[in-house]
Amino acid sequence: MSLRKINFVTGNVKKLEEVKAILKNFEVSNVDVDLDEFQGEPEFIAERKCREAVEAVKGPVLVEDTSLCFNAMGGLPGPYIKWFLKNLKPEGLHNMLAGFSDKTAYAQCIFAYTEGLGKPIHVFAGKCPGQIVAPRGDTAFGWDPCFQPDGFKETFGEMDKDVKNEISHRAKALELLKEYFQNN
């Protein structure tokens, strides 16, 4: 039986590595399409990105939108984390919560998948609760050094990649995608 082929539309090498590791029984290829940066709720953003990606690729596509949501700030920065991180770095994200006693947060990953043009878009969401801490560990992947998932003493930046790829928001969303593929 041949592997299901998935065109993952991303320009982020670290996301691609994680998706390939989690979907190891699938043939994941990367398609780098310059997608618009949409604003809105995460599910809306993922669906819009998927519609735009399928127009460019003309075949099955998978897109992702990731959020980091601070409970003390009503869910901000949320889907705009990319821009906050670019300007503030992990240290600045931690400092944003300096005036709040609530350091809890959740990482959220929304994947949107379609078989092709005119086909329905399927959305898969995963969440990982945790807290924002002073940065520790590997700084190579975004906000990983300042997010410590509940039940762990390590940040994503300190954690073994295999452990992270079992518990993360991305892993949870991709588990739902795998279930969809098994049933369709």
UniProtKB/Swiss-Prot annotation:
SUPFAM superfamilies cross-referenced by the UniProt entry: ITPase-like (SSF52972)
Keyword annotations: Cytoplasm, Hydrolase, Magnesium, Manganese, Metal-binding, Nucleotide metabolism, Nucleotide-binding
Keyword Cytoplasm: yes
CC terms in the record's Gene Ontology section: cytoplasm
Main location group: cytoplasm
Class of enzymatic activity (EC top level): hydrolase
Residues the record lists as binding ITP: 10-15, 49, 65-66, 82, 141-144, 164, 169-170
Free-text remark on how the cofactor is bound: Binds 1 divalent metal cation per subunit; can use either Mg(2+) or Mn(2+).
Binding-site residues for Mg(2+), renumbered to this chain: 37
Top-level taxon of the source organism: Eukaryota
Keyword Phosphoprotein: no
Alphabetical GO biological process terms: deoxyribonucleoside triphosphate catabolic process; nucleoside triphosphate catabolic process; nucleotide metabolic process
Alphabetized Gene3D superfamilies for the sequence: 3.90.950.10
Pfam families per UniProt: Ham1p_like (PF01725)
Annotated localization: Cytoplasm
Reactions listed under catalytic activity: ITP + H2O = IMP + diphosphate + H(+); dITP + H2O = dIMP + diphosphate + H(+); XTP + H2O = XMP + diphosphate + H(+)
Cofactor: Mg(2+); Mn(2+)
Protein role: Pyrophosphatase that hydrolyzes non-canonical purine nucleotides such as inosine triphosphate (ITP), deoxyinosine triphosphate (dITP) or xanthosine 5'-triphosphate (XTP) to their respective monophosphate derivatives. The enzyme does not distinguish between the deoxy- and ribose forms. Probably excludes non-canonical purines from RNA and DNA precursor pools, thus preventing their incorporation into RNA and DNA and avoiding chromosomal lesions.
Subunit text: Homodimer.
Family statement: Belongs to the HAM1 NTPase family.
Protein name, entry field: Inosine triphosphate pyrophosphatase
Biological classification of the source: Eukaryota, Metazoa, Ecdysozoa, Nematoda, Chromadorea
